[in-house]
Each structure stands twice: as structure tokens, then as C-alpha cells.
Amino acid sequence: MARRKLALTSLPGFERDVYALPDLRTQKMALDMLVLIRAGRVQGEPLGQHVKTGDLSDCYKFYFDPNGAGKPRYRLVYRYTPDEVEAIAIEAVAVGERSGLDVYLTAAERLGRR
């Protein structure tokens, strides 16, 4: 049985996050990562519930960097949105520089968990 192609959606504010990334190359990579996640070619790490960020246990984090050298500088937070039976979409929640907890805090706020 073929896997159904997931839709790509985003929460309000995600587009603003993308445009806030420092250059076109980084912006494109953030969007390309979502396409690769949807295709099942890459996968993020599950997030959890933490005192500082709230409950992000239905979300995943994925690190990326167009430079490809050293520690990735950017973080993408996304989640799968289900219907009654299975995931039907990948929902982009937040993206930004990998500094502190900023992206996680933005994600929690957009999900109404802060």
C-alpha cells in the first residue's frame, strides 16, 4: 500500500520566520527541509514537555545549516496533524536561529501553550 502524500501547512507567523532568516539560501533550505520531511527522506527528533518551553510533545525539531560545516545554526519545529486515523499534514510551527530557546518559545506561543 502506497503512503499517502502529506499536505504541507504552516501556522500563522511561520512565513514571517522564514523571511527573518538572514538570506535567501537559508530561507530556501528551511522550506526544502519541510519537503524532505514530508517525503520521509529526513526526520526530526521528538520534543517533549519542559518547564521553560511548555508542552511540545507533539512536535519535532530539525537542525539545518546551508554552510554544512560545524554545528547547525538553525532550528525548525514542525508537527504532524492527524485526522481520526493517521497523519494527513506536516505543519510548520516555527523556524529561526538556534540560539537559546527562542524557536521553542515561539512554537509554544503559536500553539497556545504559553
Question: Which residues does each PLM region occupy?
Answer:
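A short, surface-exposed loop/turn module that caps and links secondary-structure elements
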Residues: 38-68
